Amino acid sequence: NHEDGSNNFSNSDIYKLLNEAYYNGLGSFSYENLNKSYTFDFSNVGFKNNKTRLAIRDGNWHYSQLTDINLNVDAWFNNEYADAYYNSKVGLINASDYTYSFGSTCRNLKINKFYNCTSKSWMKNTEGIWTINPQEEMGNTVYRISNDGAVNAVWPTNEYEIYPTLYLNSNVKIIAGDGSSSNPYQLDI
């Protein structure tokens, strides 16, 4: 989010939170949003050491400023990857990342019908999830995935869950696991 209402990820408080505090495993990170103060401790959940930080590379988080929620998942994905991107160490999911978590059973649904597939996603969504996708036509809003699975535009000063995303360097190897919630990947860094 951004206190001034901007929907530009690279200028947002979330960008600072993820790429400064979370990435560096800071013990205390504070910011203010709409006259409300927040303090976070990332010493146990952020990247704990340089070895871990060196396993992460700069990545391009693709997004689209599409406004047509009548498109299906593949159309959004193609538009996101043909459009602009932000470059950073840690980013947010884009709308198509979330929709791909439903598997192939929902791929032909339109973005505005994803609430029909919420139970099929492996991503937990209890309060709504921020995406990196800006939406320009409605006054600098940002797309979020609501807790019922709908993708819609909201003001960037609202509060929702953050799912940090990152790109690993090519030398990082999967040594165990299948990527499921019951058997997550174990990495050799």
What do the PLM-derived regions correspond to, one by one?
Residues 1-189:
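Collagenous Gly-X-Y triple-helix signature in extracellular proteins
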